[in-house]
Amino acid sequence: MKIINIGILAHVDAGKTTLTESLLYSSGAIKELGSVDSGTTKTDTMFLERQRGITIQTAITSFQRENVKVNIVDTPGHMDFLADVYRSLSVLDGAILLISAKDGVQSQTRILFHALRKMNIPIIFFINKIDQNGINLPDVYQDIKDKLSDDIIIKQTVNLNLKPYVIDYTEPEQWETVIVGNDYLLEKYTIGKTLNIAELEKEENERIQSCSLYPVYHGSAKNNIGIKQLIEVITSKLFSPTQLNSDKLCGNVFKVEYSDDGQRLVYVRLYSGTLHLRDSVNISEKEKIKVTEMYTSINGELRQIDKAEPGEIIILKNELLKLNNVLGDKKRLPHREILENPLPMLQTTIEPCKSVQREKLLDALFEISDSDPLLQYYVDTVTHEIVLSFLGEVQMEVTCTLIQEKYHIEIETRKPTVIYMERPLKKSEFTIDIEVPPNPFWASIGLSVTPLPLGSGIQYESLVSLGYLNQSFQNAVMEGIRYGCEQGLYGWKLTDCKICFKYGLYYSPVSTPADFRMLAPIVLEQAFRKSGTELLEPYLSFEIYVPQEYLSRAYNDASKYCANILNTKLKGNEVILIGEIPARCIQEYRNSLTFFTNGRSVCLTELKGYQVTNIKSAFQPRRPNNRIDKVRHMFNKINLH
């Protein structure tokens, strides 16, 4: 059986979930249509999704037409969840990009198209809601050409009367897009030779698969118009890259979620080989798992299966598998660019209103962060506060609401802050000697710190031989340095430097590893006080599209939001501004652009990394440590004079 995995992507309220329901209904997978308004759809599984009316997690469902099975990965529909969209995109054989006939191409449509094109995923445009009043399809076509791609082919004629309908007929002039992309067809066409439909369709299909041509279809998901035609094109024009002739297993974990009863569900896309129940499968060179339960979606229902073929999406109940784990042979994964998940850029503290629910809150955060790599948390070992880090404020809002609605925990949070980092300004060294006041520890340590280029991270080297200082003491120094790097002079994590352990001395038998572990962060702090540190903050690279008449305003406003414009380009009636901006400023700049362009701007961003900030006073309260703080303060007092 042929298996196709598709995604349905759209801006909010374009009708994505309704289209999924309509595909299931028209194919016979379900007997009645669900409704987003009433919360009865197949794919919006979480209570929170039903309440908000937008899809937040990724659900899997399927339908079958003749000998073709189509798995639908219903991707998230909110900007703060694009990282989840990227993860889902990696398993797709094709995508339906939904465009509202009334609203046309929206900002998020362009962002999604950009991601799909970057990952070389074939795209079918579906113009939805053609049964609404005031529809002008030629304007929508032009909107697609201006904002997405000229390489489209209109595959239907549409009658917009009181009861709209579509006819599968491609106007002759539409084939010109196909002809001009093929030298052989263009030559035949130029000299007046007849082109038969078979060779045109062959070229069309090849270009769709190579992501250089985008067919356009029409309909109304709500009223089931044009859906059967869409099913036909999905099953006939999209193909899976699975290696049907390979007996070597290869599958990739792209999603983790928890059921209402706490079972951990792992979603796997199989690319080659066959997986059987009770198989033992490699997930690394030294680790295997045994498949004890295996499920897949069959006609909209989750069913247990004994065997899974290449191309299938399966669900395993497993505690070991993590996101992006590969089952079997990694070499058989298709070569497709994986867009990197951005790092969390904001943080806050989160506590339950009732202290008795603290353990329950930690359990909830474990499940949520296990499913979403953009959400991280830790318990401060000194203050015992729960610190939550995340990508955007909507993500925080959804997480907090989820904790309240699914886990029934009332919580309190502080105002989010940007996650800064620190880097030394210059090379420095510092040594604290044994038995030299105020050092109370039976240890001597000498460290040097050297700044490294941005993005280098922390590097560590020990110049003290193991013959002179044994491994347990060396390990203790490393542990102390690791702890010391958690808090710089401003209270933020240190990065982009090399730390060298240059000197160590112990007294036998009184010295212990604990002496070195306690002293190392104090020496490190003094070295950083000599070098000084500079604050770094997360930066984004951006491409901003604005109509030409707003260029001056967009350009002049850049400095107000600390944006640095590096280049400009003209594209049709738009100007593209290319540059970089602090992550803390992007939302305000984006909101401003949206306001003064009346929603006609688009802002594409990717995490660039940490850059030097012009913020001078971004202090984070230092976490106390009763075992070393008194000594720290004494050394700080001495070195001030």
Swiss-Prot record:
One of its GO terms (biological process) is translation. Pfam families: EF-G_D2, EFG_C, EFG_III, EFG_IV, GTP_EFTU. One of its GO terms (molecular function) is GTPase activity. GTP binds at residues 10-17, 74-78, 128-131. Disulfide bonds: none annotated. SUPFAM superfamilies: EF-G C-terminal domain-like, P-loop containing nucleoside triphosphate hydrolases, Ribosomal protein S5 domain 2-like, Translation proteins. The keyword Protein biosynthesis applies. Residues 1-242 form the tr-type G domain. InterPro entries: EF-G-like_DII (IPR053905), EFG_II (IPR041095), EFG_III/V (IPR035647), EFG_V-like (IPR000640), G_TR_CS (IPR031157), P-loop_NTPase (IPR027417), Ribosomal_Su5_D2-typ_SF (IPR020568), Ribsml_uS5_D2-typ_fold_subgr (IPR014721). Coiled coil: none annotated. The keyword DNA-binding does not apply. Keywords: Antibiotic resistance, GTP-binding, Nucleotide-binding, Plasmid, Protein biosynthesis. It comes from the Bacteria. Belongs to the TRAFAC class translation factor GTPase superfamily. Classic translation factor GTPase family. TetM/TetO subfamily. NCBIfam families: small_GTP, tet_protect, tet_protect_M_W. Abolishes the inhibitory effect of tetracyclin on protein synthesis by a non-covalent modification of the ribosomes. This is Tetracycline resistance protein TetS. It comes from Listeria monocytogenes. The gene is tetS.
